[in-house]
């Protein structure tokens, strides 16, 4: 019997194009000015110090850091410092009303229904916990943060590594057979399944004929009693 559901974001609750066409360009346009004009602000200074450590350049100046950040974005590198700075910029954008977090139309109602049924809800995404909370807190369906019990990012491990799901199960405090992971990526679901989890693949766009996981097109097509069999 499923007692908790852990969901991915990109391609699962939300259109991946929102991240790549809205969030990433918004941060890129403002990153250099943020470093130059606000580099002494405590939160930003901490992120820049983390970047210097990543680069092994403790004395790197602002322009060197900006060049590195632009390179990281070009390479889609999973840099902790870059994620911190992007999160700071996105926070301002959400609060200013420059954009709202995108959710597919059925997601909010289904999440609320599951919570009302007594299920615990969690998020596991490659985006930082703060970025996750911003997306759900300023979503096009309102503030959904009260629906979630907790959030996980890659600090627990990469999403294609089986041990990451063991770590999350331990943090949640439930056995793997009572957990359901939702994602659009087959390899992530493979890792969760290897850890003993139930899985469901969201097919929002292109079909995945290789996958062996249960597949649905929408959250409201997920039939939880099937997982009790």
UniProtKB/Swiss-Prot annotation:
Note on how the cofactor is bound: Binds 1 Mg(2+) ion per subunit.
A Pfam entry, by short name: Hydrolase
GO biological process assignments: L-methionine salvage from methylthioadenosine
Protein EC: 3.1.3.77
Cystine pairs: none
Magnesium listed as a keyword: yes
Pathway the protein takes part in: Amino-acid biosynthesis; L-methionine biosynthesis via salvage pathway; L-methionine from S-methyl-5-thio-alpha-D-ribose 1-phosphate: step 3/6; Amino-acid biosynthesis; L-methionine biosynthesis via salvage pathway; L-methionine from S-methyl-5-thio-alpha-D-ribose 1-phosphate: step 4/6
Top-level taxon of origin: Bacteria
Reaction equations catalysed: 5-methylsulfanyl-2,3-dioxopentyl phosphate + H2O = 1,2-dihydroxy-5-(methylsulfanyl)pent-1-en-3-one + phosphate
GO MF annotation list: 2,3-diketo-5-methylthiopentyl-1-phosphate enolase activity; 2-hydroxy-3-keto-5-methylthiopentenyl-1-phosphate phosphatase activity; acireductone synthase activity; magnesium ion binding
Gene3D superfamilies membership: 1.10.720.60, HAD superfamily/HAD-like
Cofactor or coenzyme needed: Mg(2+)
Key words, A-Z: Amino-acid biosynthesis, Hydrolase, Magnesium, Metal-binding, Methionine biosynthesis
PANTHER family: ENOLASE-PHOSPHATASE E1
Assembly: Monomer.
Function according to Swiss-Prot or TrEMBL: Bifunctional enzyme that catalyzes the enolization of 2,3-diketo-5-methylthiopentyl-1-phosphate (DK-MTP-1-P) into the intermediate 2-hydroxy-3-keto-5-methylthiopentenyl-1-phosphate (HK-MTPenyl-1-P), which is then dephosphorylated to form the acireductone 1,2-dihydroxy-3-keto-5-methylthiopentene (DHK-MTPene).
Family: Belongs to the HAD-like hydrolase superfamily. MasA/MtnC family.
Record-given protein name: Enolase-phosphatase E1
Species of origin: Pectobacterium carotovorum subsp. carotovorum (strain PC1)
């Amino acid at each position: 019997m499923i007692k908790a559901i852990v969901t991915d974001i990109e391609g699962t609750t939300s259109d991946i194009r929102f991240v790549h066409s809205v969030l990433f360009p918004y941060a890129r346009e403002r990153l250099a000015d943020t470093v130059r004009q606000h580099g002494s602000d405590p939160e930003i200074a901490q992120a820049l110090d983390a970047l210097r450590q990543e680069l092994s350049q403790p004395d790197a100046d602002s322009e060197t850091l900006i060049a590195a950040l632009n390179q990281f974005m070009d390479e889609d590198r999973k840099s902790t410092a870059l994620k911190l700075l992007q999160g700071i910029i996105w926070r301002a954008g959400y609060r200013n009303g420059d954009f709202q977090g995108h959710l597919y139309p059925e997601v909010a109602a289904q999440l609320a229904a599951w919570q009302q049924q007594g299920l615990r809800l969690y998020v596991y995404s490659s985006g930082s916990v703060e970025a996750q909370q911003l997306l759900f807190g300023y979503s096009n369906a309102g503030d959904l943060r009260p629906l979630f019990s907790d959030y996980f990012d890659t600090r627990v491990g990469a999403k294609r590594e089986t041990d990451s799901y063991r770590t999350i199960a331990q943090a949640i405090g439930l056995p793997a057979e009572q957990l359901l992971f939702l994602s659009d990526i087959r390899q992530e679901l493979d890792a969760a399944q290897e850890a003993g989890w139930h899985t469901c693949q969201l097919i929002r766009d292109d079909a995945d004929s290789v996958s062996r996981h249960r597949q649905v097109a929408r959250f409201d097509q997920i039939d939880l009693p099937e997982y009790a069999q």
